[in-house]
UniProtKB/Swiss-Prot annotation:
One family name in Pfam for this protein: TPP_enzyme_N
Cofactor: binding details: Binds 1 thiamine pyrophosphate per subunit.
Source species of the chain: Listeria welshimeri serovar 6b (strain ATCC 35897 / DSM 20650 / CCUG 15529 / CIP 8149 / NCTC 11857 / SLCC 5334 / V8)
Family, similarity comment: Belongs to the TPP enzyme family. MenD subfamily.
Class of enzymatic activity (EC top level): transferase
GO molecular function terms listed in the Swiss-Prot or TrEMBL record: 2-succinyl-5-enolpyruvyl-6-hydroxy-3-cyclohexene-1-carboxylic-acid synthase activity; magnesium ion binding; manganese ion binding; thiamine pyrophosphate binding
Keywords: Magnesium, Manganese, Menaquinone biosynthesis, Metal-binding, Thiamine pyrophosphate, Transferase
Protein name (record): 2-succinyl-5-enolpyruvyl-6-hydroxy-3-cyclohexene-1-carboxylate synthase
Cross-referenced NCBIfam families: menD
PANTHER family, alphabetized: 2-SUCCINYL-5-ENOLPYRUVYL-6-HYDROXY-3-CYCLOHEXENE-1-CARBOXYLATE SYNTHASE, PROTEIN PHYLLO, CHLOROPLASTIC
């Protein structure tokens, strides 16, 4: 044992112990040499749960999914060099979707920086503005002052990651050789000088009385709508419904709002706006005086188009942090306060009998018409087209299941075909940067928290992250993946690019012709190809009770998919005309 080893051990033990005391329970480690002391010290901690992922990009998204589902900070550890750069996509997503990650990167000591040393690159501010905070840690020392410094940075990292708006934090650790700390006796049970832990307390932003009264006055007796985008706060679901009923306002609820699947059905929850707002002819009948938006912007483009054309209205955006989430430049009042506080205080201060029943009835009539058409069409459809897959999942998913939703077509089909249901289904997706990469790993991370967990994903997105399946094999994780295989980029068939057939397939269709049954075998998963509704039901039922990885593949046709969607929209348009 050398003094260097003791210094290294004491310094890192102080830091890691403080992370745990501040609320960290899991660490995702990407193997490497320079990160050896941090990896060993985290593995030695009696409370910290360790996952080892050899693919850094997968590791980043696994941590993202776990932090998203658990709502607590998760640690990521990588060695020096390009390994750390592979975390970038997950960090960008975490920043935009406000997920608390603590990224630890090992680095060469200062004397080996910028001198051509192997596996060394500039890691200072590596993630730029995509992290909330960056610290280049001091070289290890074990004086009282430096041990306080180490533990202080552990507390501070968790505090910054968890403070509203939540997000990723990066700490870079320069480490000298030798890199092996002392594990006997355990650095977490050895006697010696102890340092107190920092207790962190959080508060909620609230509004002053005059602002509350102004908002109540603006909303009393007015035609208004709530727009609720992706927001993962179960505590606001019932208060939102209660306030909407009192005001007589509809709630336009994105699939990721939680309001379509929180265990109850309510007429005020509008789930088919994406379908009926495609018809601009009805917009004049639905012009509000007030809009109050919670969460990020919903996925629906027809909703976005409708909101953009509104004028001379009061448009509130509610955000508990300092973010400015107004991509359509419509906000008239930006409210930075806790959502539950606002709903409760408005409910308390809002006069009774102020609702305009005809206003809510108009919205529910359009919604019910569109919903009945969608449900009827899906009941009468015997083939496994893409909308039918979502409709069947809505029926087949067990109560309290988790559903991770891929980007591109899957999230949009869930918006259209997954209407309100009286089951509790936890829906998750990466809707910060909206990328199709890392979705498998994110779902696996979320599966640590929610069971049973299902993933609805397209073939290209699945291909992007097949490496992530190693975690399912290694840790015997329970995940059912439903691959909608339309052999390429299905969403492009709905976009203007489809009007240029000369290069469409080569540049946008991008057929891969991959056989995914081999991916299932490679990672010890069960494979099922569903060619009919009955086969899909059988596969989902088996997977629900099977512990391990299940891959259910449904092959569809991109061109038929577009035609099927258009036929449904045409029928909804016809049904809406009958209401006028």
């Amino acid at each position: 044992m050398t003094n260097h080893e003791q210094v290294l051990t004491d310094y890192l033990a102080a830091f890691i112990e403080e992370l745990v005391q501040a609320g960290v329970k899991e660490a995702i480690i990407s193997p490497g040499s320079r990160s050896t002391p941090l990896a060993l010290m985290m593995a030695e901690h009696p409370i910290l749960k360790i996952y080892v992922d050899v693919d850094e990009r997968s590791a980043g998204f696994f941590a993202l999914g776990l932090a998203k589902a658990s709502k607590r900070p998760v640690v990521l550890l990588s060695t020096s060099g390009t390994a750390a750069a592979n975390y970038f996509p997950a960090i960008a997503e975490a920043n935009l979707s406000q997920i608390p990650l603590i990224i630890l990167t090992a680095d060469r000591p200062h004397e080996l920086r910028n001198v051509g040393a192997p596996q060394a690159m500039d890691q200072l501010h590596l993630y730029g503005s995509h992290v909330k905070d960056f610290t280049d840690m001091a070289l290890p020392e074990n004086s009282d002052e430096m041990l306080r410094y180490a533990k202080w940075h552990g507390s501070r990292a968790v505090d910054i990651a968890m403070k509203t708006p939540r997000g990723p934090v990066h700490l870079n650790f320069p480490l000298r050789e030798p890199l092996v700390p002392i594990l006997e006796p355990s650095p977490y049970t050895a006697t010696g000088k102890k340092h107190h832990h920092v207790h962190i307390y959080y508060t909620h932003e609230v509004l002053d009385d005059s602002s509350i009264q102004k908002m109540v006055t603006d909303c009393t007796g007015k035609k208004g709508v709530f727009v609720v985008g992706p927001i993962d706060k179960k505590e606001i679901e019932q208060p939102m419904v209660d306030l909407a009923k009192k005001l007589g306002w509809p709630i336009l609820a994105d699939p990721l709002s939680g309001l379509r699947s929180y265990g109850a059905k309510d007429d005020v929850v509008i789930d088919q706006y994406d379908a009926f707002l495609k018809e601009a002819a009805i917009w004049d009948n639905l012009t509000p005086e007030v809009v109050i938006r919670f969460g990020s912007m919903p996925v629906s483009k027809p909703l976005k188009n409708w909101l953009e054309q509104l004028s001379d209205i009061r448009f509130y955006v509610v955000d508990p942090g300092a973010a400015w989430k107004d991509p359509i430049k419509a906000v008239t009042d930006m409210i930075h306060c806790d959502e539950r506080f606002l709903l409760d205080i408005m409910q308390k201060n809002m006069p009774d009998d102020t609702k305009i029943s005809a206003w809510l009835n108009r919205w529910t009539a359009y919604n019910q018409t569109a919903r009945e058409i969608v449900l009827t069409e899906m009941e009468n459809t015997t083939t496994l087209e893409e909308g039918k897959i979502v409709a069947e999942l809505r029926r087949l998913l067990p109560d309290k299941a988790g559903l991770f939703i891929g980007n591109s077509m899957p999230i949009r089909d869930v918006d259209t075909y997954f209407s309100q249901i009286d089951k509790k289904i936890k829906m998750l997706a990466n809707r910060g940067a909206n990328g199709i990469d890392g979705v498998v790993s994110s779902a696996l991370g979320a599966s640590v928290v929610f069971q049973p967990m299902f993933l609805l994903i397209g073939d290209l997105s699945f291909y992007h992250d097949m490496n992530g399946l190693l975690m399912a094999k290694k840790y015997k994780m329970n995940l059912t993946i439903i691959i909608v295989n339309n052999d390429g980029g299905g969403i492009f068939s709905f976009l203007p690019q489809a009007k240029e057939p000369k290069y469409f397939e080569s540049l946008f269709g991008t057929s891969t012709e991959l056989d995914f049954r081999f991916a299932a075998a490679f990672y010890d998963g069960d494979y099922h190809e569903a060619k009919s509704v009955d086969e899909l039901e059988e596969a989902v039922d088996k997977a629900t009770y099977h512990k391990g990885l299940d891959i259910i593949e449904v092959k569809t046709n991109r061109h038929e998919n577009k035609a099927n969607h258009q036929a449904l929209w045409d029928k909804i348009a016809t049904g809406l005309k009958a209401l006028d």
